[in-house]
Amino acid sequence: MVKLAFPRELRLLTPSHFTFVFQQPQRAGTPQITILGRLNELGHPRIGLTVAKKHVKRAHERNRIKRLARESFRLHQHTLPSMDFVVLVKKGVADLDNRALTEALEKLWRRHCRQAPAS
């Protein structure tokens, strides 16, 4: 049976983890969200989230966006390639409802799966 947990090892935790992804990213994006990815050697995907106060003013909106991104990643973790992902949020994302945001994230996960080199 497939576990759908979200343990600590599935998260990017340190600035060096984020820097690693920013150096040579593979990009997939919409006007409101960009997901950067870079292959890792761990055998499983990891995610890091950046939701700037500059783009989403209210804390409860930032928390909602991060919660939906984490949940989307958690549900797709077994179909994703072994990559480190950073979810970047742009202006206008707070205007999306939960369904539209979830659909956008799913579309971006599928795009990363197609772009990933076969392993």
Swiss-Prot record:
GO cellular component: ribonuclease P complex
Recorded superkingdom: Bacteria
Catalytic activity: Endonucleolytic cleavage of RNA, removing 5'-extranucleotides from tRNA precursor
InterPro entries: Ribosomal_Su5_D2-typ_SF, Ribsml_uS5_D2-typ_fold_subgr, RNase_P, RNase_P_CS
SUPFAM superfamilies: Ribosomal protein S5 domain 2-like (SSF54211)
Subunit comment: Consists of a catalytic RNA component (M1 or rnpB) and a protein subunit.
PANTHER family: RIBONUCLEASE P PROTEIN COMPONENT
Listed name of the protein: Ribonuclease P protein component
Organism: Yersinia enterocolitica serotype O:8 / biotype 1B (strain NCTC 13174 / 8081)
